[in-house]
Amino acid sequence: MSEYRLEMRDVVKTFPGVKALNHAQLKLKPGTVHALMGENGAGKSTLMKCMFGIYHMDEGKVIYEGQEVQIKGPLDALNRGIAMVHQELQPIPERSIGENIYVGRYPTKKYGPVTVIDHDKMYADAAKVLKEVHLNYDPHAKLGTLSVSQMQLVEIAKAVSADCKVLILDEPTSSLTAAEVEALFTIVDELRAKGVSIVYISHKMDEILRISDEVTIMRDGHYIGTWDAKELTTDKIITQMVGR
């Protein structure tokens, strides 16, 4: 049995005129926070979008729980237990918080010969997952009544609702207040303790050194290396990111 829950091996992804990923790699252990770092354009988000099925790799392999898998799209990734909280939020503000948490995978029930959304179960489950991530929000309330930072925390609740084994957080604190950052770190610590593998993308060195167990650095689409976070300093990270 591999010590890794998920491996991305030799991933190549080319867009017109640019090789965004050039044999990139990442190895995630259970119950760890793995920071993914690099300058803008290093390929971090592209690699994660390949993991989550938004992009399809030109070359490379994804090994998940010991098996090579083909992730066909985001819903396939979610069904496998891989969730992603994007830097660019895609909320549906006119829908309820509960509907946003379960969009695309609503619980259903039979009403005679017809299959319909089971709203009672959806809202009960949404209330449970909101409580699990310490959010005191009414799942029936419209998402649009929340601030941008509160919507970001709902996205994390959405990921947790999928009972994820791998959680990708792409710049998760970009719109959060200091108190909300602390709330996020509490959630991350609890998920790590439950064995979830967390990928944490951030440019904030203090966050990386505080929350991470391992750090992988990318540069110009290439894998540079992986370090134990305890071995790193801000200067060493910057040196590896810029290559000089």
Model-identified regions with their sequence ranges:
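Glycine-rich phosphate-binding loops of nucleotide-dependent enzymes
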Residues: 2-244
